[in-house]
């Protein structure tokens, strides 16, 4: 039986170890990380894509598949996803200086989303780039590209709400680990290239979702 109370306590304790200052050099390699599922959720599939910055040329990628260890439990997603992410990370030869993770950083009820959890375990600077809001007050943005609001939980800033593309839902950006609030937004902006998602997580999302087009395009780019 899964002890959810113990897992939540572990999140609270690990959140105290999260560093929210910039501890990385100007990156020449940036990675995107995302997780998908196969066999009706029985298999967890993680993809990590390393890209040269600023060309966004793909350097390498790793896909890891493991038996799913936990069912979906709101707020405990990182315990479900991190084991597969760590397995994929172990196979990466060209380690990046910065990783964009599809999911939350500190914008989490206990301030430990998958980007923060993975960054702490792998000891790598991370940014959470989420497609939906998990916590904090939602705010309506103008439809203009670049419209930005702070993602707040009472008096605490958790991240940013950012319009990356017209007529698309905004992104919810938050620092994960060893990245400041300001840098989290700035680096996502630098990696937007005409799509809703920044290039690193756009590619990781496509590969982790098992889309054949992304697999083929990726082979062509290598």
Curated annotation (Swiss-Prot):
GO terms for molecular function: deoxyribonuclease V activity; magnesium ion binding; RNA endonuclease activity, producing 5'-phosphomonoesters; single-stranded RNA binding. PANTHER family: ENDONUCLEASE V. It is found in: Cytoplasm. Its cofactor is Mg(2+). Mg(2+) binds at residues 34, 102. Its EC number is 3.1.21.7. Coiled coil: none annotated. The gene is nfi. This is Endonuclease V. It comes from the Bacteria. The keyword Glycoprotein does not apply. Pfam families: Endonuclease_5. It comes from Proteus mirabilis (strain HI4320). Belongs to the endonuclease V family. NCBIfam families: PRK11617.1 (NF008629). Signal peptide: none annotated.
């Amino acid at each position: 039986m899964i002890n959810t109370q113990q897992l939540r306590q572990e999140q609270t304790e690990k959140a105290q170890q999260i560093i929210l200052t910039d501890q990385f050099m100007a990156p020449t390699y940036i990675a995107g990380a995302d997780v998908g599922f196969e066999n009706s959720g029985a298999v967890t599939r993680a993809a990590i894509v390393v890209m040269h910055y600023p060309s966004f040329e793909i350097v390498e990628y790793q896909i890891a598949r493991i038996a799913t260890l936990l069912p979906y439990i709101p707020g405990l997603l990182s315990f479900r996803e991190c084991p597969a992410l760590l397995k994929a990370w172990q196979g990466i030869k060209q380690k990046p200086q910065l990783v964009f993770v599809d999911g939350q950083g500190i914008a989490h009820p206990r301030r430990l989303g998958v980007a923060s959890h993975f960054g702490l375990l792998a000891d790598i600077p991370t940014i959470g780039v989420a497609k939906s809001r998990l916590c904090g007050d939602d705010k309506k943005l103008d439809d203009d590209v670049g419209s930005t609001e702070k993602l707040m939980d009472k008096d605490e800033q958790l991240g940013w709400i950012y319009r990356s593309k017209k007529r698309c839902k905004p992104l919810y950006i938050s620092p994960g680990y060893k990245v400041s609030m300001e840098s989290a937004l700035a680096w996502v902006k630098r990696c937007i290239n005409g799509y809703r998602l920044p290039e690193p997580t756009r590619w990781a999302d496509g590969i982790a979702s098992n889309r054949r087009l992304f697999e083929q395009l990726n082979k062509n780019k290598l």
